[in-house]
Amino acid sequence: MKEIIIIEHPFSRYYLTELRNELSDTKHFSETLDRLSYIMAGFAYSSVELKQKKVQTPLDLTSGYAIMKKIILVPILRAGTGLLKGFVDLAPDPVISHIGIYRNEETLEPIKYY
């Protein structure tokens, strides 16, 4: 990853506010997280490389596109798994792996456990 992308989309700002709201119940939180994940995935996938391919339509042969590389999703266990839905739904046959990390509460350093 070359840079941090700050998503300025109005819905992402709204959804983030809803996630931060202590009055959001579990169902609302989960649904809001799913919606935010679609926005994030759209931005993240905007740099996926494509290659041209031919496809036969019912009328004629035409040009189209195929994704060049397999998409591998690696959410960090606990926090990252809640954002998985939008990324999985938008990608064609993604591979899903996991990394487990928690933060040391005293040093604030990440510690891998899986």
Where are the language model's segments positioned?
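PRPP-associated nucleotide enzymes
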Residues: 1-114
